[in-house]
Amino acid sequence: MILKNKIKTRTEDKSTITDQAEVILAHRYYLKDTDGDVIENSSQLFSRVALAVASIDTQYGKLPVDAQLTEKDFYTIMSNLEFVPNSPTLMNAGTEQGTLSACFVLPLEDSMEGIMKAAHDAAMVQKFGGGTGFALSKLRPKGDRIKSTHGIACGPIEVLKTLSRVSSMITQGGKRDGANMAVMSIYHPDILDFIDCKKVEGEIHNFNISVGVDSNFMKAVEGNMDYNLINPKTNEVAGSLNAREVFDKIVYGAWRNGEPGMIFLDQVNKDNHVKETYGEMIATNPCGEQPLLGNESCNLGSINLAKFYKKAEKAHAFGWKAEIDWARLEWVTRKSVHFLDNVIDANKYATADIEEMTKATRKIGLGIMGFADLLIQMQIPYESQLARDAGSKIMKSVREWADDESKQLAKSRGAFPAWEDSNYDKQTEVYRNHCRLTVAPTGTISMIAVTSSGIEPTFALAWKKQNILEGKTLNYVNKYFEQDARKHGFYSEDLMDYLAEGGSLATVPEVPEWAKAVYATAPEISPDDHVLMQAAFQEACDSGISKTINFPNSATKEDVEDAYMLAWKEGCKGITVYRAGSREKEVLVKGNADKSEQPTLDGFELEEQMLESNHDCQGGCNIVFESGCETCKTCGWSACLIS
């Protein structure tokens, strides 16, 4: 791999990088020579990224000495694990290959040329290391006449299968399989076929699917009313369906195997400030948290909230038993916005159209991770109003600082080029970036930062990791839980074994009630509380949030329906659900205590899946499904490109 800039080695505090993080970095992120041998360490990786991204400052009139100060700040926030950019930036910054962005949406026009261009551009994006989203909503329905050839349209589902086959041929950035999202409007005549297109597990395996709905449809569901289907080619009514029956079909699919998800498009487009000029956002990136216009891309990064815990001498006015280092959080937020804006210019784009559109709106996605770990340190149960209030306050603060920093950048660099065509207030809302915040899945980068993923609760307190080479199986325990268990006298190896086998802390009599509440895991938290937490963060987030609403295996279709309705009423931009054990080909997530609550995968299928997915946990796989994405807690493999 060729470097654009000479790497400068720094001395680092090795304690910030754990052994597990080191394994993940070596396997997935460190540069390697032609023999595949690692040629950098974590300090050099962060130096490489900081130098490449900070050098952009000189394009905006800064002196080299000022760019060096920026480089130092960028290195600091990354090496301290206070901020970590999305995986493509870590992998590719400072090299001659690959993109620095993870999220793309490509236009899919209703013509042979448009479909083939989308397939070509998707291949180029995924070759560069990105994931792609498509809206099928503009494609004419199956069976429509094609005037130019007197033929019959194959329909959106066949186009989707074609895109899936193209994606299967590409390994993203040489490191992972293609990842995609397909969205179809609820008003499309082929919507029923779309809802069922992944009914057979394994079909269209490299696409997530979501149905795009709006409040009119949801109100029709509530009223058990019919609604019209619209042919996108003619804009004429093509039939009608009962909204309740279609909604029930969506719910059944989600209950059956987690798909389709739902995207509330009218809620999404409330934050589309260039709608009058560029149209509506009707698709998202593969994990669903980043709505984009056709040919837009977005680079993401996440602040590690667990790093901002600060002990307090007395209870905070909010009722918290600890404090947050707000001053440091503001500083890191501002540096992160600066970093992400620079990435837009440091980036290498797969097509000229993507570069043009991305630089027109200059969207960035600053998010968070480590929220559950912060709550644990503050002794606040995730399943509480206090936790939701904390999340809301944090997100509103980050939004305020991110908005202001984007305004400051606009003063020195100019507003995003499409700003003149936007509905932003021309006196008070002069932004460098069309949107600023996105809560992405952080499966792998949160493992590098040794923290919880996104805004998800802790998935497990203990889990088993097999070391095939040494023939050992070891328990890995959440560090905060182990500290508290030892401090308060309820630690035992038997308890750790029990939890690693899938047992619940709630059933252990000797564990105090406060610990059971603070350390409740994702499968134990009610679906309503999952949704309400997502909504608490969504209020201040101008893009979307990737989060999984966890259900036990025993959940009913009515339970899933309630979650979908609650997400809509609470103002979420989308929803993804997962019922434990609802997919045939899954790996064990937490021991063996209750098989009915655990997905399973036999050894042969597991080995085959991991090889196909560039998985390298040597048989000690530990997959969790969170933030709408499968991630291995052992080796850092993730199905999501952002992670």
Feature-to-residue mapping (PLM):
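Gly/Pro-rich turn-and-neighbor structural signature
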Residues: A54-E96, L100-F104, E109-S111, P232-G239, ...
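Internal maturation/activation junctions in enzymes
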Residues: V332-E355, K359, I380-T442, E513-K516
